[in-house]
Amino acid sequence: METIAKHRYARTSAQKARLVADLIRGKKVAQALEILTYTNKKASALVKKVLESAIANAEHNDGADIDDLKVAKIFVDEGPSMKRVMPRAKGRADRILKRTSHITVVVSDR
């Protein structure tokens, strides 16, 4: 049984979050949580929260045994970017893109 959890509009770039997602793809959830706990990245806290939500969904909604669960799929898609202006010298301005991402975690007992 596959169970899904999503975090939409996460305030991190998809490129940075994918580095963390690649670390836990295909691992058992206990091992994945341990890896995320000791990974020193902002995105690891966001991914860990989504993984914990997926585990809770599997246990509560599907009655799955936590010991059998593994990270079947994890992917990070780009969300919309917030456009901001950074004033520069001589009256110029640069556009700053504050990027967001959609983090999706699928856990499975198979």
UniProtKB/Swiss-Prot annotation:
Gene3D superfamilies: Ribosomal protein L22/L17
GO molecular function, a single term: structural constituent of ribosome
Keyword Transcription regulation (UniProt): no
InterPro entries per the UniProt record, alphabetical: Ribosomal_uL22, Ribosomal_uL22_bac/chlpt-type, Ribosomal_uL22_bac/org-type, Ribosomal_uL22_CS, Ribosomal_uL22_sf
Highest taxon of the lineage: Bacteria
GO cellular component, as recorded: cytosolic large ribosomal subunit
Keyword annotations from UniProtKB, A to Z: Ribonucleoprotein, Ribosomal protein, RNA-binding, rRNA-binding
GO BP terms, alphabetized: translation
Signal sequence extent: none
The keyword Nucleus is annotated on this UniProt entry: no
Family: Belongs to the universal ribosomal protein uL22 family.
Subunit structure: Part of the 50S ribosomal subunit.
General function of this protein: This protein binds specifically to 23S rRNA; its binding is stimulated by other ribosomal proteins, e.g. L4, L17, and L20. It is important during the early stages of 50S assembly. It makes multiple contacts with different domains of the 23S rRNA in the assembled 50S subunit and ribosome. The globular domain of the protein is located near the polypeptide exit tunnel on the outside of the subunit, while an extended beta-hairpin is found that lines the wall of the exit tunnel in the center of the 70S ribosome.
PANTHER family registered for this protein in UniProt: CHLOROPLAST 50S RIBOSOMAL PROTEIN L22-RELATED, LARGE RIBOSOMAL SUBUNIT PROTEIN UL22M
NCBIfam families xref list: rplV_bact
Protein name (database record): Large ribosomal subunit protein uL22
Gene expressing this chain: rplV
